[in-house]
Amino acid sequence: MPKLIINKLGPVETCELECSQFMNFTGFQASGKSTIAKAIYYFRTIKDDIIELAKSQALDATPVYGAKSTLSIEHGITLRKALENYLREKFLRTFGSSWGMPNDMYMEYHFTEACYVKISLENDSRYSTPNYIWITMSNELIRFLKANNHTLSVTPLGVSEEDLRIFKKNLYEIFEDSCSVVYIPAGRSMITLLSQQLSYIYATMDDMQKRSLDT
């Protein structure tokens, strides 16, 4: 059974939770229910992130007019490095800046006994920012990312559907999870979440998106 482990993230001091198909959280306000839900969403959508990054990698190598992925990728980067970079950005979007977090904060999700992802912080002079977000992945997942680096082919219509089908099949077998995940914040939390992330959202927008806000 999948397992979530959290240490010192937001209001959650410690948490070790086996994740079943149906879970119901009850408790006082600001007790960490939303933090746990967001953490599960963060990890459960990693497989979708890998798929979109692999598609972006293929289209970056062989551009096709009108074909695009929902995620952008740095030119020439490996699939593993692209995933690490994206998970850092995704963490900041989901939980906010890591600068004020305890240095011993970490969270990890065990999809299976052999497949897991861990997010922790590194306070080291080698990195340009304090509390650098460090990504640790299981050997099985690392092997998959290496074996499937630049494996999707491109046709005049976009990424090969057959290649993508095989890619998804192999990926879902590693995660033992083929379900789509949707996170819907509580209505009272929507404004709070938006206000916390507004500066970051604006900073990541391109010039055209920023101009559209003024029209």
Predicted ranges, named:
Residues 1-214:
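P-loop NTPase switch/coupling surface
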